[in-house]
Swiss-Prot record:
Any Gene Ontology CC annotation: cytosolic large ribosomal subunit
Name of this protein: Large ribosomal subunit protein eL8
Gene3D superfamilies: 3.30.1330.30
Entry annotated with the keyword Ribosomal protein: yes
Any one GO BP annotation for this protein: maturation of LSU-rRNA
GO MF annotation list: RNA binding
Top-rank taxon, per record: Eukaryota
Gene it is expressed from: RpL7A
Similarity remark: Belongs to the eukaryotic ribosomal protein eL8 family.
Species this chain originates from: Anopheles gambiae
Keywords, in A-Z order: Ribonucleoprotein, Ribosomal protein
This protein's record includes keyword Oxidoreductase: no
Length: 271
C-alpha cells in the first residue's frame, strides 16, 4: 500500500480589528497598593468620635433677628387667611408700566437738600441787601408723605397717586385705595417703599402724588392713567372679594395625604 503524505494546513495569522474612530479607550484600572500593616477601620461619626464630614449647615445657622423676622412674616402671610383690604397690596403694577410711571415721576422730583439750602441762602442775601423779590409760583413737584397725599386726594387735586406695597405698619395706607376710588382719583400700588424714597431723597416713602404736569407730558400721563384705572380703580369690586394666604406647608400637606391614604385603605378593606 502507498501511504499518503499528510497535507500541511496553512496557518493564517489573526488580524486585529481597527477600533471605532469615536470609541473611548478603556481605562486601565491601576490596583492600589495596600500596606497590610495598616488596618481598615470604619469611621464612627458619633459625638466625640471621628471628625465630621463637611455638610451644608446653613439650616442650623443662627441668622440675625431682622432676617428671622422677615422669614417668619413671609411664612405667616402664606399660612394665615389675609383679608382683602390687606391682600390687595400683593397685587402690584406690572413691570413695564411701573418703569414708565417711574420715568414720569423722575421729571417732577422735589429739589434736593443742597439746592434748597443754596436757594434759601440766596433769598436771604437778597433780602438783607434790600432787594424784594416777588413771590414765585410753586413748581410742579411730587407731593410726598401720607398727610400731604390724603389732603390732595380729599381736595381732588391729585392726578395720580402711587402707593408702596411694603409699608410697615400697613395701617398707614390700608384705607388709601378706598379713599382714592371714592374721590375718583386714579391710584396704583407699586413695588418698593425704598424705590419711592429715592424720588424724594429719603430712605423710604409710603406714597407720592402728582398734582400738576407740564403740557408736553399730558398725553403720556393720560395713557398711564387709562392703564392704571383699568388695573386698579375699575377692578376694585373684584379686588375686595379676594382673600389671601391659607396655603399649607409641605409637612401639613404630607400629613393630610397620609391620612387620606389610610382612609382609602380602610374603605378597601371594608369592601
Amino acid at each position: 500500500m502507498v501511504t499518503k503524505k499528510p497535507v500541511k494546513k496553512k496557518v493564517v495569522p489573526k488580524q486585529k480589528v481597527a477600533p471605532a474612530p469615536l470609541a473611548k479607550p478603556k481605562k486601565v484600572e491601576v490596583k492600589k497598593v495596600v500596606n497590610p500593616l495598616f488596618e481598615k477601620r470604619v469611621k464612627n461619626y458619633g459625638i466625640g468620635q471621628n471628625v465630621q464630614p463637611k455638610r451644608d449647615l446653613s439650616r442650623f445657622v443662627k441668622w440675625p433677628k431682622y432676617i428671622r423676622i422677615q422669614r417668619h412674616r413671609a411664612i405667616l402671610q402664606k399660612r394665615l387667611k389675609i383679608p382683602p383690604p390687606i391682600n390687595q397690596f400683593t397685587q402690584t403694577l406690572d413691570k413695564p408700566t411701573a418703569q414708565q410711571v417711574m420715568k414720569m415721576l423722575e421729571k417732577y422730583r422735589p429739589e434736593n437738600p443742597i439746592a434748597r439750602v443754596q436757594r434759601l441762602k440766596a433769598k436771604a442775601e437778597a433780602k438783607a441787601a434790600g432787594k424784594e423779590e416777588p413771590p414765585s409760583k410753586r413748581a410742579n413737584q411730587l407731593r410726598q408723605g401720607i398727610n400731604s397725599v390724603v389732603k390732595m386726594v380729599e381736595q381732588k387735586k391729585a392726578q395720580l397717586v402711587i402707593i408702596a406695597h411694603d409699608v410697615d405698619p400697613i395701617e398707614l395706607v390700608v384705607y388709601l385705595p378706598a379713599l382714592c376710588r371714592k374721590m375718583g382719583v386714579p391710584y396704583c400700588i407699586i413695588k418698593g417703599k425704598a424705590r419711592l424714597g429715592t424720588l424724594v431723597y429719603r430712605k423710604t416713602c409710603t406714597c407720592v402724588a402728582l398734582t400738576q404736569v407740564e403740557n408736553a407730558d399730558k398725553p403720556n400721563l393720560a395713557k398711564l392713567v387709562e392703564t392704571i384705572k383699568t388695573n386698579f380703580n375699575d377692578r376694585f369690586d373684584d379686588i375686595r372679594r379676594h382673600w389671601g394666604g391659607g396655603l399649607l406647608g409641605p409637612k401639613s400637606m404630607a400629613r393630610l395625604a397620609k391620612l387620606e391614604k389610610a382612609k382609602k385603605r380602610e374603605m378597601l378593606q371594608k369592601n
